[in-house]
Amino acid sequence: MDITELLAFGVKNKASDLHLSAGLPPMIRVHGDVRRINLPAMEHKDVHSMVYDIMNDGQRKIYEETLECDFSFEIPNLARFRVNAFNQHRGAGAVFRTIPSKVLTLEELNCPKIFKDISEFPRGIVLCTGPTGSGKSTTLAAMVNHVNENDYGHNLTVEDPIEFVHESKKCLINQREVGPHTLSFSNALRSALREDPDVVLVGEMRDLETIRLALTAAETGHLVFGTLHTSSAAKTVDRIVDVFPAAEKEMVRSMLSESLRAVISQTLLKTKDGTGRIAAHEIMIGTPAIRNLIRENKVAQMYSAIQTGQNVGMQTLDQNLLDLVRRNLVSSNEARNEAANKDAFPG
């Protein structure tokens, strides 16, 4: 099998990832589990040539100099793939993350109705958080798509690499990739403030400078979507504040309390019928009560504020997990693995 055939096999079998690793057969991750493809082990030269052949000259140079490289790759009429090429103790390795060619809608993802309202905020910062592979990019792409279908504005994305490709519908869409189109997230965000955007998507808020610029963009009247790898709203607020030096923390809390509109923390669970995965969400909305807790550094009280805020669309992860179990979509065991209060989910 060549790389196109392997990727087509993965897409056909609903794989989220294809793993190539010298010394082992190709493997795919399906519904969270890594499975071997019934093929012989691959040699270093096989993996190396498969990956090397789909890189451009710039990517090859990075790969040769740093021994690893991130890039995106598209097979027309099949899908786009986010690729990480690396080296390991048996030789070359690579992981291809499948990015569906179609941007799914919020309805197709079965997102709560509040996600549409969040997408329609005129300004502020909206964060989608969770571990790697929890569907953050998919959720944010659906939210950007909702804006694109309902607004006449300018949506600007900064990604590393570009994942979902958006067509301009009602909105003007400009997508920039770190590397080919800009040297860094912070450079692109600095420029974004002069590019007349209504919505700015920041693929990853990795460092102090990027977080500072995202907060500034939100404060100056833009709607900013961003991602972090935190597992809850409270941890998200702490993570942002902790990035800044002690002398700035109080000011950042004040900025965050004014500009944070929502935090969606999500995780993916196997469905009870074994046919796929479903997202569970903690949803925090920046109500006056939440803003006060952020400003006064009472983040520990945030969980109970979310718990009692269902009338405005808030929910804890455990509340959502209980609902998924009640609706027979997820097993109690599967929900318990992700729950904060495991006693609420009997074996």
Descriptions of predicted regions:
Residues M1-G347:
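Short, flexible helix-loop junctions that flank or precede catalytic/ligand sites
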